[in-house]
């Protein structure tokens, strides 16, 4: 399991990744954000995808389309995760 956590102005996010053969098999999300459904939606888009930068970017783009009001928060999440998994 690979765990990452960060505190943003809009809430804290902790992600636990189970990675098998380079692919994300499971993601657990812990957040005190007022909109946890946005983070959960994003995390669900990562399951069964490769654990790499492109996956994060694609999942963020899909989530931004579903939740356009949270574009800025999702961009912050993307910037953090891309740096954290490199």
Model-derived regions: residue spans:
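Active-site- and interface-proximal helix/loop "cap" or "latch" segments in soluble metabolic
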Residues: 23-86
